[in-house]
Amino acid sequence: MPNWLSLAEQVMEGYELADEEALAILDCPDDELLLLLQGAYRIRSVYYGNKVKLNMIMNAKSGLCPENCGYCSQSAVATAPVKTYKMLDKETLLRGAEEAYRLQIGTYCIVASGRGPSDKEVDIVVSAVKEIKERFGLKVCACLGLLKPEQAARLKEAGVDRYNHNINTSKQHHPNITTSHTYDDRVRTVETVKEAGLSPCSGVIIGMKETKQDIVDMARSLRELDADSIPVNFLHAIDGTPLAGTNELNPRYCLKVLALFRYMNPTKEIRIAGGREVNLRSLQPLGLYAANSIFVGDYLTTLGQEKSADYKMLEDLGFEIEFSPAPQIGVV
């Protein structure tokens, strides 16, 4: 069997996994899983110690999306009963930021449905972010869809720290998930974000009938894109979406996926994102031996577990919350 600790040491010296080594992680026998996670934790602990970054989503605009993404309950092809509303106002976004501050959330994520933001929607986000930075000093991540260079520049100027735009899957599998935009459209937005000086956040959704080679390709593509933060979502197959009833993930495989992303992107923030609770289930704590970041609270159209359960999990693991806000005028 592979010596996972030895491989971890090689990775930290700059070694990049070959495809066969990456696939071996996904094919790791269950009786070696803890050894695999030991290697992943060796990497994680060198770069992040025992700290965990907390993130919280504000669903700033829900539904009403013209795209045809097969996984999404907000898409034009979904029949799932989701709330639909236009962009929230500044005051509502500020109330969400205040809650995030009270919960020791390091990154407040403003997420809006749709192909891409209108200039008016960017205006609202810009206005809110300026005040969020002044009052709470939180890091802010925006996720508004495909982005124009001038919009990216405005977000950067307002104080947005990070922009999320997931590649979601591999380039070869992308047409099986959506045809209303291309994989290259997504990559172009990540590049636009980087050019504007924003920290790029880009991740994946696992469980959409992709192959193991697809997953390896995703991890490698994100390394090549140099994404600072990589959210790993596990499909929560919602009734009324084209992918409903297709999820065949199990908790052990999800842990192997998280380990793969750590071995292939050793220095990056790896976040256990959507679908954590329903796919990792009782093995959620083990995921943090590979990942160093989670979402707290609810997702866009699905519920997370009770916030208190997340904080108790971190306490039981002996991990510390990374929280260092820098408000400019103090919390009021």
UniProtKB/Swiss-Prot annotation:
The keyword Iron applies. [4Fe-4S] cluster binds at residues 65, 69, 72. It comes from Geobacillus thermodenitrificans (strain NG80-2). Residues 47-273 form the Radical SAM core domain. [2Fe-2S] cluster binds at residues 109, 141, 201, 271. This is Biotin synthase. Its cofactor is [4Fe-4S] cluster; [2Fe-2S] cluster. Its EC number is 2.8.1.6. Pathway: Cofactor biosynthesis; biotin biosynthesis; biotin from 7,8-diaminononanoate: step 2/2. Belongs to the radical SAM superfamily. Biotin synthase family. SUPFAM superfamilies: Radical SAM enzymes. Keywords: 2Fe-2S, 4Fe-4S, Biotin biosynthesis, Iron, Iron-sulfur, Metal-binding, S-adenosyl-L-methionine, Transferase. GO terms for molecular function: 2 iron, 2 sulfur cluster binding; 4 iron, 4 sulfur cluster binding; biotin synthase activity; iron ion binding. Binds 1 [4Fe-4S] cluster. The cluster is coordinated with 3 cysteines and an exchangeable S-adenosyl-L-methionine. Catalyzes the conversion of dethiobiotin (DTB) to biotin by the insertion of a sulfur atom into dethiobiotin via a radical-based mechanism.
